């Protein structure tokens, strides 16, 4: 915190942590450390967890919400707060509450987005005012998908996902289906059938594509649909309404883009009852983008 500046109020409530879609995802190689190199475009969408923060003066960091299957000490939001505390040298702590809406293991970045919202919110709540690049560096130490949410806009990503270039995307509506099946990321990336040699694209290739939602493919899709039957069935069903429907991330969510809300809602009305679905609008920027 800059000397002489007043602290903001002690609470930040209703902080969104929006989901993302991977419009395509190409696996281009594997590094000696085991991480895969990727190319993808991240599309932010208006479907969010909501986080609430209360500043503490004793330096203690707690998650006050119970999340089944996610111990507080290993939760990315707690790890993000601790990393932010260490990087900034602040004396403050925080109580964090989470309204968890986004499905875990869905490929839409829920945990990573929660971590990024924590970094952005604490940057404001603690008055530390770290630059965005520093928050992105902290985010990368937590997970490869965290930096794009801190980056704050739709982006063409390379490396392990941390080399980001902003891209302009048209306003869109999406149907996102979660087939109520958890897909562990490690189970997909460790599969021996995964191809890891997709040709390198450049951002100009994507920018020049007239239908950006038909560009490329998701290299993880064939593995996920072979291993997880509900993912395959949901994708096959959605392709009846959009030939360019595809999986996001390593699954389990699948999505399709539509020109308008009415068309997307008509598809949603036909959704089989055994799956969960959502009609969502695209975002051009993260709701907390100005916090860094």
From Swiss-Prot:
Biological process (GO) annotations held by this record are: isopentenyl diphosphate biosynthetic process, methylerythritol 4-phosphate pathway; terpenoid biosynthetic process
Which residue positions are annotated as catalytic? Answer: 20, 145
- Which SUPFAM superfamilies does its entry note? GHMP Kinase, C-terminal domain (SSF55060), Ribosomal protein S5 domain 2-like (SSF54211)
Family matches, as Pfam families: GHMP_kinases_C, GHMP_kinases_N
Q: Per UniProt, which keywords does this protein have?
A: ATP-binding, Isoprene biosynthesis, Kinase, Nucleotide-binding, Transferase
Provide the transmembrane region boundaries: none
Supply the InterPro entries for this chain. Answer: GHMP_kinase_C_dom, GHMP_kinase_C_sf, GHMP_kinase_N_dom, IspE, Ribosomal_Su5_D2-typ_SF, Ribsml_uS5_D2-typ_fold_subgr
- What does the record give as the function of this protein? Catalyzes the phosphorylation of the position 2 hydroxy group of 4-diphosphocytidyl-2C-methyl-D-erythritol.
Q: Which family is annotated? A: Belongs to the GHMP kinase family. IspE subfamily.
The protein's matches in NCBIfam families, at most eight in alphabetical order, are given as:
ispE, PRK14608.1
Could you tell me what this protein is called?
A: 4-diphosphocytidyl-2-C-methyl-D-erythritol kinase
Q: Which organism is it from?
A: Cupriavidus metallidurans (strain ATCC 43123 / DSM 2839 / NBRC 102507 / CH34) (Ralstonia metallidurans)
The gene for this chain is: ispE
């Amino acid at each position: 915190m800059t000397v002489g500046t007043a602290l903001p109020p002690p609470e930040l409530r209703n902080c969104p942590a929006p989901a993302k879609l991977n419009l395509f995802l190409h696996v281009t190689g594997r590094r000696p450390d085991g991480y895969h190199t990727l190319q993808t475009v991240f599309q932010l969408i208006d479907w969010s967890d909501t986080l609430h923060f209360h500043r503490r003066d004793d330096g203690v960091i707690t998650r006050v919400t119970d999340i089944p299957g996610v111990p507080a000490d290993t939760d990315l939001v707690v790890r993000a707060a601790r990393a932010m505390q260490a990087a900034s040298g602040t004396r403050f702590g925080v109580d964090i509450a989470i309204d968890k809406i986004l499905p875990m293991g869905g490929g839409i970045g829920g945990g990573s987005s929660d971590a990024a919202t924590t970094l952005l919110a604490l940057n404001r709540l603690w008055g530390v005012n770290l630059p965005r690049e520093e928050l992105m560096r902290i985010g990368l130490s937590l997970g490869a998908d965290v930096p794009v949410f801190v980056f704050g806009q739709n982006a063409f990503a390379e490396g392990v996902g941390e080399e980001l270039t902003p891209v302009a995307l048209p306003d869109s509506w999406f149907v996102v289906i979660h087939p109520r099946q958890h897909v562990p990321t490690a189970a997909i990336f460790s599969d021996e059938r995964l191809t890891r040699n997709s040709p390198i694209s450049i951002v100009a290739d994507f920018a020049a594509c007239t239908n950006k939602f038909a560009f490329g493919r998701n290299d993880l899709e064939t593995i996920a649909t072979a291993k997880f039957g509900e993912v395959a069935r949901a994708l096959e069903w959605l392709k009846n309404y959009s030939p360019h429907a595809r999986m996001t991330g390593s699954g389990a969510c699948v999505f399709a883009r539509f020109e308008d809300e009415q068309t997307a809602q008509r598809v949603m009305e036909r959704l089989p009852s055994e799956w969960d679905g959502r009609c969502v609008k695209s975002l051009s920027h993260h709701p907390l983008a100005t916090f860094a």
